[in-house]
A protein has these predicted regions:
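N-terminal presequence-like segments and the immediate start of the first folded domain
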Residues: 1-361
Length: 361
C-alpha cells in the first residue's frame, strides 16, 4: 500500500497538465487515486478534461504561486476501478473508496448538507458499507461560510446523531472550509442582520437560501471510506485542543490508519485554538501560524508520527494579503513538503489561518 502526493501549481491549466503528464510518465506503475483542482473561478471549467473517478473541483483561489493548482494522489499496489464520482482501491484484505464532488443544489445549506450525507450513505450502502462504520475522512466546502456554515454544522450534527456518531462513540476526521462548488454562482449574500456562525455559537440558523430562480450548490463534500484489515485510532491532543463538541461541532481532530505494515495519519483542518476551544492570538497571523503548528505537532506526536513523515499540506487563509507573511514561515520550516496556499476563509472570522496535512510511512 503506497501513496504519493503531489501539489502541482501553474499559471494556467496547460502548465498544470504538462506537469501532471510528466509525473505520470515518470511513474508508469502508479495509478491515479484522487485529484482535486483548485480554481480561481468558473472560467476554466470548460478547459478541464472529462475524467472518471474521484476528481474534485473547487473554487479556492491559489495564492503566491500561479493561479491554479492540483492535488494529485497516486497509488501503487492496488487494483483500481473508477465508477462515477468514486475511485475504488482494492488491496489484499482491504478496500478504500474515495468519493469526490458530492453536491445537492437545492435549498439551504442545512438542507443541502443533509441531502449530501443522505446521498453519500446511499453510495456506501451500495458497497455494503456504512457512514458510521467505514467513513474516516470528509472535506466539506461551504460558500459564504460566515453565514452558511451554521446550517452545515446543524445538519451534520443531526445526521451523525441519527447514525450513532456521538461524543460517546466517535465522529469523523474532517475539514470544513470556505469553497464554492465549481460551476456554481456565488451564494447570495446573507441579508442585513443575519447572524453569522461566529455570532450564534449555538448553530441555530439553517443558512440563507438563494432565490428560487438562482438555486445553486452551496455545499460540496469529498470523502474517504475504508473496509477490511484496517485499524484506526482517533487523535485528540487534549493538552492543546478541546473536544470539538465543546463548541457545537462534530468532527475528530485526526485519525491514524494502519494496514499491511503501512500507516497514514490524516490531520483534520486545524487552527490556532486552545484546550478550552478559544481562538488564540486574534489579529496576529504569524502567531496563529505558530500555535497552529504546535497543535498539529501534538496530534502527530499522539499518532506516533512526526513532521518528517508529512507528505502534503493545504494551508487556508482568510485574507489574501496574509500569504505574504505566512508563506515565508512555511517555506523556512518545511521547504521540501508539497503544499499550496489558498484563499479560503476559516469557519470563525477570528481564525486567520488553518492547515491540514497527511503523514505516512
Amino acid at each position: 500500500m503506497k501513496f504519493n502526493h503531489y501539489i502541482i501549481k501553474g499559471q494556467n491549466l496547460t502548465e498544470l497538465q504538462a506537469q501532471q503528464d510528466g509525473i505520470l510518465s515518470a511513474h508508469p506503475q502508479q495509478q491515479v487515486a484522487f485529484k482535486r483542482y483548485f480554481l480561481p473561478d468558473n472560467s476554466l471549467l470548460r478547459q478541464l478534461p472529462a475524467e472518471e473517478g474521484a476528481v474534485s473541483h473547487i473554487i479556492q483561489p491559489v495564492l503566491c504561486e500561479g493561479s491554479v493548482a492540483l492535488w494529485l494522489v497516486l497509488c501503487e499496489g492496488f487494483r483500481v476501478r473508477y465508477q462515477g464520482c468514486e475511485t475504488i482501491l482494492e488491496g489484499e484484505g482491504f478496500r478504500l473508496i474515495v468519493t469526490a464532488s458530492l453536491t445537492c443544489p437545492d435549498g439551504t445549506s442545512e438542507e443541502q448538507t443533509r441531502s449530501i450525507f443522505d446521498a453519500y450513505a446511499t453510495l456506501l450502502q451500495g458497497h455494503g458499507l456504512t457512514l458510521e462504520g467505514n467513513c474516516v475522512r470528509t472535506w466539506l466546502f461551504c460558500d459564504d461560510i460566515d453565514h452558511q456554515y451554521a446550517g452545515l454544522v446543524k445538519a451534520r450534527r443531526e445526521f451523525f446523531a441519527a447514525c450513532g456518531l456521538t461524543p460517546q462513540t466517535h465522529f469523523i476526521a474532517s475539514t470544513g472550509i470556505a469553497g464554492r462548488p465549481a460551476g456554481q454562482p456565488a451564494a447570495q449574500p446573507a441579508g442585513a442582520g443575519t447572524p453569522s456562525f461566529a455570532e450564534t455559537r449555538e448553530y441555530a440558523p439553517s443558512g440563507v437560501p438563494a432565490p428560487a430562480a438562482a438555486r445553486a450548490a452551496i455545499v460540496q463534500m469529498d470523502a474517504l471510506a475504508v473496509e477490511g484489515a484496517f485499524t484506526q485510532r482517533y487523535l485528540y491532543a487534549r493538552t492543546h485542543l478541546s473536544p470539538t463538541y465543546d463548541y457545537g461541532v462534530t468532527f475528530e481532530r485526526g485519525v491514524r490508519l494502519d494496514a499491511s505494515g503501512h500507516h497514514a495519519t490524516l490531520i483534520s483542518g486545524t487552527a490556532s485554538i486552545d484546550h478550552k476551544g478559544n481562538i488564540l492570538h486574534e489579529g496576529d497571523v504569524a502567531a496563529q501560524t505558530r500555535r497552529m503548528w504546535e497543535n498539529v505537532e501534538a496530534l502527530l506526536d499522539e499518532a506516533g508520527d512526526a513532521w518528517s513523515n508529512v507528505r502534503m499540506m493545504l494551508i487556508y487563509l482568510r485574507n489574501r494579503e496574509d500569504a505574504a507573511f505566512v508563506k515565508p514561515l512555511f517555506d523556512e520550516r518545511f521547504p521540501d513538503t508539497p503544499k499550496v496556499f489558498l484563499h479560503a476563509p476559516v469557519c470563525r472570522p477570528g481564525w486567520l489561518v488553518e492547515m491540514e496535512c497527511i503523514a505516512s510511512a
